[in-house]
Structure formats: structure tokens, C-alpha cells
Amino acid sequence: MLSSEDFGSSGKKETSPDSISIRSFSAGNNFQSSSSEKTYSKQKSGSDKLIHRFADSFKRAEGSTTRTKQINENTSDLEDGVESITSDSKLKKSMKSRHVVMMSLGTGIGTGLLVANAKGLHYGGPAALIIGYILVSFVTYFMIQAAGEMAVTYPTLPANFNAYSSIFISKSFGFATVWLYCFQWLTVLPLELITASMTIQFWNDKINPDIYILIFYVFLVFIHFFGVKAYGETEFIFNCCKILMIAGFIILSIVINCGGAGNDGYIGATYWHNPGAFAGDTSIGRFKNVCYILVTAYFSFGGMELFALSVQEQSNPRKSTPVAAKRSIYRIVVIYLLTMILIGFNVPYNDDQLMGAGGSATHASPYVLAASIHGVKIVPHIINAVILISVVSVANSSLYAGPRLICSLAQQGYAPKFLDYVDREGRPLRALIVCCVFGVIAFVAASSKEEIVFTWLAAIAGLSELFTWTSIMLSHLRFRQAMKVQGRSLDELGYKATTGIWGSIYGVFFNILVFVAQFWVALAPLGNGGKCDAESFFQNYLAFPIWLAFYFGYMVYNRDFTLLNPLDKIDLDFHRRIYDPELMRQEDEENKEKLRNMSLMRKAYHFWC
């Protein structure tokens, strides 16, 4: 583009050097000198403008809140417009579909799945590990169904699932749960950075871990100060690596177990007999080991609740939600359960390299050990490199989700108002700075207490998932009860959870049992001879007293002692999308007719995908 500097005072463009070739040599030199000065001046001006734009990007974004009638032109005929409070979006949504698809598959695959389950395998054994993950996987699916129904019904609700409990349970319950969820994301950054330093020690344990922490810390902060586009591109690359690693690990583990690779020949179920399927000598001890693994499993499944957010991005959530829920089953079965089974068959629970085993090298991931202890040379280094990428990826996600969650809390009045600052590039700047400051905790990696800090942070994150998932399923139950009390038909719902209210009832009941079991495990920790240990209790149950402090603190400060919002007073139409039952039945019949006319291959794809 031509700037004003390319034109004279008359507005005409300056004569080019070629057009003045008939002038004298000296005149030509004078022109070239003048031209060079102009070029330098333009470059300097361009640099100044770039610096000025970068500085201006940190100024507060402009936005307003209005009441509008929202009608999505991309939705089907059966979706009516809804009247809602909307605000001009300050947080820029610059991610493309390829980013969203890959994130739905890979986001959350990090410390919980790749590293923390080493302690679960060591303390519980392979059978206890698999049982724990299977039990939690059922709750995960029930939570996804409940969140899906609510997200389709309330697609424009501010804060999404974080607002459900405030509306359908009580404000104090919602305040405590969402702040604990915020604490989870704040702890994820230092937790993942510590894990990254532990992962690198597989190669070199002589260099100060804080050096690695500093490198990753600066790298991540640098990404997020350049906005959401930089985050989207880096996450796309990270998640591609994670998915490829999981696929390769599954194939390699089967080959190793069958004797096709490594030095040990056919392994089969050898480690289920020696050292055994369960760790522990008594039945009560083995049961306690399973209880210990449950919280680790919740920590590993962390992030699955973000499924509800993806529903909001779809043009027709009524169609996309069943598909997304079906695909979540594959993620649960393949990425979580299948890999746990393969680890249980290929890694003995008494290996001294597992975290918590007390050996000299207690930092190796079971994914690495599944190959390295059988004599496979190069592959363990590749797996460890991808695990390193994975934990950095989750730390990257925490710097994306954490500041936006804090900003959302400030906008709802649940956090100090100054934290709602969003700059012109869509960065929640002050909230981002808070998260970055919290990440400094990671520099304890050079301390001998590194693994203890890791356990504390993981305990907060694990139990916070319990609270968040319980709030989603309990809100779903309260929503259904309010529909019944207010005489509303379920036919008005665009998507009904396939597990109904019974899935949510089971999920809430099971989570309550997990809270009780975790209390027992925390009070009388494993390997302590059944004796009580106060330090272990707070180390493993810290999230519960934090939640209670927020819950009763909100009650006292606001003088709001409501335990449950009255069912007949709940506003079911706030940000709700209304569906016409007759049009939904008509659309379902049309879809069935299309399915009958499909080829066999298309029918198979429709059934499975």
C-alpha cells in the first residue's frame, strides 16, 4: 500500500529514478541520496508504528453490554431465537476448526495420564489401576451426558458449566466450586513445569532442574503475550505429537508383550502373577489401594468437562452433541483404559523406577518403562520426548484457560473487578499476570522436596475435578426437578442425556463415596501401618477444606444462607434455547429416512462415528 509519504504536496506520486536518467550525474547522486534518506525515514517510521501498535495492544479493549434478540442463521428451522444478555466479545476467538478438532482429542493428555499414574501402579498394582480407571470412566461418561444436555439447553449462558451450580443449587455452592476449579487451573502451570523437569531427568539428573523450568516458563509466557493465535498453533502441533505417541505406544506395547521386540520374549500376564495383580497383603489393604487410585484417575480425566464448551461452538448443537458424546467414548476406551491395561501387562508394580517406589530414579513415566525395561533402546527416548511435549502442552493450556476463567469470575462479581481487564488483542492481561506469578512455584524443582510439592499440587487438582463434576451432575438433577415442578415438558429439550437422571444420580452418589474413601486414605495413608498422619491428610485432602472455606465464607460475607434454591423459583428460561417438539420429530424422521437410503459403508460410519 502507498503511504502519504509516497506523494508530494499536490497528491501526485513522486517521479521514479528511471524517469530522470537524462539528468546530470550530480543531480542523479543528489536524488539517490534523497531517496535513501526517504527509504530510511520510512523504515524508521514503520518500526515506530509497529512498536506503537504493540504498545497500544495492551490498552483496554472497548466493549458494551446490550440486550439483544439472538437468532443464529446457521441453525436449523427448529431452533428459535432466544432473548439474552450478551456482550461485545473482547476475548478474541481466532482458532480454526483444525485447532478445535485436535484439541478435543489431545487436550488434557498430560501429567495425570502420562506420569502421575506411576504412583497408582506402584501402590495398587495393575488390577487396582484398571479397576479404578474403569469406575471413574463410567462417571466421566455420565458427566459428559449431563453437561451435553445442559449445554444444548443453555448455549449462551455466561461461564457455561461454571454457572450451573449458582443457578440450580445455590450461589454459595457455585462460588466455592468455581473458585476451587480456578485454583485447579492455577496449580496446573507449576505442576506441569515441575513434571517437565522430572521428565528431563530421565536423560540427565545432574543439571539444576530450575534451568529447564526457566526455559519452559519463558517460552510459555512469550507465547501467550502474543495472543490466542500463537496458542492455537502451538497446541495443534503439541496435540498431533501426543496422539501419534499414544497410537505408537499401543502398537509397540502389544508387540513387546507378544515377544516381537525387546529382550524378554513373550511376557503375557507374567507380571499379574509375579509380583501380582494387586499390591498389598490383605483385602482391606488392596481395597484401600483402589481408593487411592480413584483420585489419580479423576486427575487424569481432568479436562473432559470442557466438552460442554465445544458444544457452544457448533452451529447445530442438537446434532453435534450425540456425535461428540460418542467420540468421547473412544477417547475414554482407547487413550485411557487401553493404555492402562497395556502398562499393567508390561510394567511390574514393584519396579524401583516408578514414582513413589523410593528408588534412586523415581521419576520415569510408566509409558517409558514399558519399553525401556525390556531392552528397547531408542523408542523410550522418543516416548519421553513426547511426554515432555505433552506436559508443556497442558501448561500451555493452563495459561489459556486459567486467565480467562479468572476474568470470567471478575465479570460475574466473584473476583476483584480489576481482574476483568482485557486488552485490544483479546488478552485477559491482569489475570494472565496473576497466573504467571503463581507459576513461579515451579522453581522448587531444584529442591529435595520436589516430589512432595508435586503431590500437594496434584491433590488440589484431583479433588477439584470431583467438585466440578459433582456440581455438573447435581445441577442436571436439579434442572430436571425444576422442569417437573414448573410443569415443563422434556420434549422442549433439544438433547436429552442418554443416561437420563439415573446416570447423574449414580455419578453424584459415587463421587460422595470417593470423597469418603479419600478421607480415609488421606487420614491413614498407605504404607503407614494404618496410623493417622496429619501431614498426609492435608497433603491429599487439601481441596476439601479450601472448598468449605469458600462456601461458608460466601455465606457469611453476603448473609446468604440458602442451601438450595427453591425449585419453583429457578429461572429456567434465562439464556435458554427453545426447541419446537413437532419440528424436532419431523427432523428426526427425515434423518432416519436419509439413513435408510445410505450405503452400507455410510451406515457403518454413522453407527460408529
Swiss-Prot record:
Side Extracellular, residues: 121-123, 195-210, 257-289, 350-374, 449-451, 522-536
Molecular-function GO term, any one: L-phenylalanine transmembrane transporter activity
Keywords: Amino-acid transport, Cell membrane, Membrane, Phosphoprotein, Transmembrane, Transmembrane helix, Transport
Leader peptide range in chain numbering: none
PROSITE patterns on file: AMINO_ACID_PERMEASE_1
Top-rank taxon, per record: Eukaryota
Gene Ontology BP terms: amino acid transmembrane transport; amino acid transport; L-leucine import across plasma membrane; transmembrane transport
Recorded topology in the membrane: Multi-pass membrane protein
Modified residues (Phosphothreonine): 15
Membrane side Cytoplasmic: residue ranges: 1-99, 145-173, 232-235, 311-328, 396-427, 473-500, 558-609
InterPro entries to which the protein is assigned, alphabetical: AA-permease/SLC12A_dom, Amino_acid_permease_CS, Amino_acid_permease_fungi, APC_YAT
Stretches that traverse the bilayer: 100-120, 124-144, 174-194, 211-231, 236-256, 290-310, 329-349, 375-395, 428-448, 452-472, 501-521, 537-557
A Gene Ontology term for the protein's cellular component: endoplasmic reticulum
Phosphoserine found at: 3, 16, 19, 21, 24, 76, 84
Family: Belongs to the amino acid-polyamine-organocation (APC) superfamily. YAT (TC 2.A.3.10) family.
Note: Present with 8660 molecules/cell in log phase SD medium.
Function: Permease for leucine, valine and isoleucine. Also transports cysteine, methionine, phenyalanine, tyrosine and tryptophan.
Record NCBIfam families: 2A0310 (TIGR00913)
PANTHER family assigned to the protein according to its UniProt record, in alphabetical order: AMINO ACID PERMEASE, LEU_VAL_ILE AMINO-ACID PERMEASE-RELATED
Protein name: Leu/Val/Ile amino-acid permease
Organism (species): Saccharomyces cerevisiae (strain ATCC 204508 / S288c) (Baker's yeast)
The gene coding this protein: BAP2
